[in-house]
Curated annotation (Swiss-Prot):
PANTHER family hit by this protein: THYMIDYLATE KINASE, UMP-CMP KINASE 2, MITOCHONDRIAL
Highest taxon of the lineage: Bacteria
Reported function: Phosphorylation of dTMP to form dTDP in both de novo and salvage pathways of dTTP synthesis.
A Pfam family that the UniProt record links to this protein: Thymidylate_kin
Organism: Onion yellows phytoplasma (strain OY-M)
Family note: Belongs to the thymidylate kinase family.
GO terms of molecular function: ATP binding; dTMP kinase activity
GO cellular component: cytosol
Keyword DNA-binding: no
Protein name per its UniProtKB record: Thymidylate kinase
ATP-binding among keywords: yes
Gene this protein is translated from: tmk
GO BP term (any one): dUDP biosynthetic process
EC number: 2.7.4.9
Chemical reaction(s) catalysed: dTMP + ATP = dTDP + ADP
Amino acid sequence: MFISFEGCEGTGKTTHSRYLFEKLSKKYSCVLTKEPGGGLFNEVIRNILLHSSNKQIDFHTEALLFAADRAEHLSKLIIPALQQNKIVICDRYLDSTIAYQVYARGLSQDFVLNINNFALNYIPNITFYLDLDPKIGIQRVKQFRPKEINSFDLQKLSFHKKVRKGYLDLCQKDQQKRIFLIDASKPLENIYNIIEQKLKEVFQIEL
């Protein structure tokens, strides 16, 4: 099973993916990973993409680096784990690329999907999209991880609003009902319960 967490900055993706991993690991064989990142080579790409100096990078170069990270991530970690019947929990995946590179950066969706074509056969079984007003999300980032501000955190509020619109459009167009929207302004415990209930309801996973 493949589970992904999506959302703008400061929505709690990392917190909730880690919590779910800790819960599921008590009963199932699980892998917790992230994008960009997830391996030694991937961390090199992650450092390039998230460094504060990345604000000036060409948008096509940025998209290609994300695609390279995903190709390595899939071949070295995600696919092998799925083949071993492990549950893969990923903090960001392909939906992030659409929201950030297409909606916020303004790149052609055809271009972005073409360079990520290899990933289209490995779509998550369920995606938890944590929705939050971007202004609140950025405030959370500054409050809870002030020493870990990255290049995307430094973007203007208008950029983050475009990212959110991208995610909401993906939710609306999701004919497979793969993406499950959660109000990320709710208390953490409430969100945990919503995630657990959804997994029990759809996949009969007991936590």
